Amino acid sequence: MDAFGCGFSSRRQHRRDTGSCCRDLQLVLAVDVSYSIGLDELQLQRTGYVEAFRRPEIMRAIGTGRLGRIAVTYVEWGGKAVQVLPWTLIEDRQSAAQFAEALRRQPIRRISFTSISNVLAFARRLVHLSPYRGSRRVIDISGDGPNNAGVPAPVARNSTVTQGIVIDGLAIMLRDTPDSASIPDLDAYYRQCVVGGEGAFVMKVSEASQFSAAILAKLTAEISGLKVSGARQPRPEPAEYAQSYNCFIGEEMQERSIGR
């Protein structure tokens, strides 16, 4: 029995179970839809997740687990968060394809502001209220700017990690020149201020053409519990914390923009 109440009986036995029985992974996909991301990028981001769950690499990653099944929910966020797809059991190609199709049919949303702390709190609640239990619990958060609303990101990060939940990040860095809502070292911000927990990592997208490959590599790593390897794959960078890094840069930028 692990820390989350998940025993390790056979895969066959678990496939006969229903309800709140255990899964290898509870995965919250938390996707930034703030107005600082262009509509084209939003569509590329959505398409990247849809295509990923149709790929055989995802099923192979799921198959590496002891139980061969995971639970996934899809959230979109800005200043607030919205659960777009409910907790869904994925254990075979059919269930993965159904999840992908359900996501494809959802409208693209836009939400003002960028509150990493709010979405982390929202995702924590989803994990605890889920009908499923995972031997691993991961929040996969993507975004294109630092936290500028709610409590500071490190506070939310620490609250999440102390509950045994890992936070991984995808830093979206498509701008040639930063604007009032972005910073040039967003990947460093995510490593220092957002992600955390055992094996936590950050990946970055600096060109729109990288979305699909980065999303697939990130999901494969999270589902299998392994780091991404291979020269052709985007490489994750582990979390690292330095007291000298300014984790309040987003809040300071927001204050300057409104003239405080």
Segments from the language model and where they lie:
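Second-shell loop/turn segments in exported
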Residues: 30-40, 72, 86-88, 102-113, ...
